[in-house]
Amino acid sequence: MVVVIEMSAKPRLDRGRAGNGLALLAALGVGATLAGCGSSAEVTPAGSAAPQSPVAQPSPAPYDISRIGAVVDDFPQDFTAQAHPAKTLGQSDIDGSAVAAFTNAVVDPPQCRSVVIPPYVDPKVGTEAAGVIGQGDQGNMYVVALRSPEPIAPAPDPAGCDRISLSGSPEASGSVERVAAPAIAGVTTTGVKLSVADPEADPDYLYTAALDDRTSVVVMGSAAEELDPQRLMSDLLVKSVSAIQGQQQP
């Protein structure tokens, strides 16, 4: 979501109904090819001394985002869920993931883009991603764990963003409103509901969690009303964070 996953057709977030989905969901959940994570090291220029820390503290072990696959059994009973191993994203992955359509959308108020896609879940070249895709007659849901190549600290949401509109392209048009995100100790969480004008289309939900300044989780998609999609995806976020926190790489 070292194996390259190519999808010949993107699953429809509206489960085949007429109507436009919001490109955000495709941007993060579908169409991206997810390979091992490389690491980089800073090089000290010749002739200069590396700065010395008063006390050397070992860095905490990075979270193993491949553990996101543990939630494959937490989807509704009639969903078919498939885990996709971790892969490092290149520019072609991001260009092919429909993120460009969302990036070019008009966000009103303009300062509210970070409410819809917090910076820590906005994929960049070098981001490592792993995920689970769950599909069924009653919906499509995507769970993606991300590890950024550089630290991205969560920032407070801007004011005046309780309701947001997206426009500018058929793939990225609709309204966005904040919804309650689950409280997880030591973790920053967000939640939004995304709606399009088509009354036949179910709303989409997007929940995010920042475990630290490099590791994050996104749960997104839509489901039939009888499944209580807001509760369902909120619970999936909690379970996803728990799965990743359960064991760290040595």
Sequence positions of predicted segments:
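C-terminal motif of bacterial Sec signal peptides marking the signal peptidase cleavage site
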Residues: 33-36
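A small/polar (G/S/T-enriched), proline-flanked helix-loop surface module common
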Residues: 72, 79-205, 230
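Bacterial N-terminal signal peptides that target proteins for export
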Residues: 5-25
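Bacterial signal peptide processing site
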Residues: 38-41
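Short, well-ordered beta-strand elements
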Residues: 143-144, 214-223
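Short, solvent-exposed coil/turn segments at beta-strand boundaries
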Residues: 185-188, 209-216
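Surface-exposed amphipathic alpha-helical segments
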Residues: 221-250
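Post-signal peptide N-terminal segment of mature Sec-exported envelope proteins
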Residues: 46-71
